[in-house]
């Protein structure tokens, strides 16, 4: 009972954070810049094709957050948000060090590790996974999925950048500044 309450609190907190960040990136709500601003941000990070990575990141946060909140297909939701945090830490925050006040990876690490813990433990008794009898999906599926996500990111990011540099494909043209 206590474990299920703890998992529910973690799911709701972390899931809502990702859901709202994804909504900022997808829809430009809650002070976000929408897909155009997110695309420009990805371009500035050197992630190409930037529009593709903007969509992947925004959907990863939004859909992953929603799945975690609902406790529905929780290992998949946890994989989505963990993947986003891996990229955020590697491309944005790692060079700035650990501390969040200097733009470091501290906050993203907490969110990412919490998502990993949820992926390993499952959503708990108060979840759609439990109601549907899908709780057994959890740990093994998540670990295998995490390895696959890490390998895909390690291959896809450099490959996308190489293709963009050598073909001109993926050089996004922004019609609106990031602040729109």
Show where each model-derived region lies.
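Extended, low-polarity transmembrane helix blocks
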Residues: 1-30, 51, 74-180
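Transmembrane alpha-helical segments of multipass membrane enzymes and assembly factors
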Residues: 68-74
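Membrane-interface interhelical connector segments
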Residues: 28-53
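Short hydrophobic alpha-helical membrane-embedded segments
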Residues: 52-60
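Hydrophobic alpha-helical segments within and immediately flanking transmembrane helices
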Residues: 41, 64, 83-87
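Hydrophobic, membrane-inserted alpha-helices
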Residues: 59-68, 92-93
């Amino acid at each position: 009972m206590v474990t299920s309450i703890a998992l529910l609190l973690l799911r709701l907190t972390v899931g809502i954070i990702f859901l709202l960040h994804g909504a900022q990136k997808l829809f430009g709500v809650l002070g976000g810049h929408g897909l155009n601003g997110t695309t420009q941000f990805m371009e500035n990070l050197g992630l190409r094709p930037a529009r593709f990575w903007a969509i992947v990141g925004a959907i990863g946060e939004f859909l992953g957050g929603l799945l975690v909140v609902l406790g529905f297909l929780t290992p998949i939701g946890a994989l989505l948000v963990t993947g986003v945090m891996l990229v955020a830490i590697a491309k944005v925050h790692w060079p700035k060090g650990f501390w969040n006040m200097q733009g470091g990876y501290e906050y993203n690490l907490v969110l990412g590790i919490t998502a990993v813990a949820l992926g390993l433990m499952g959503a708990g008794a108060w979840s759609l996974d439990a109601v549907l009898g899908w709780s057994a999906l959890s740990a093994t599926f998540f670990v295998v999925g995490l390895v696959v996500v890490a390998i895909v990111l390690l291959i896809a990011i450099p490959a996308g950048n190489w293709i963009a540099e050598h073909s001109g494909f993926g050089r996004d043209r922004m019609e609106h500044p990031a602040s729109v």
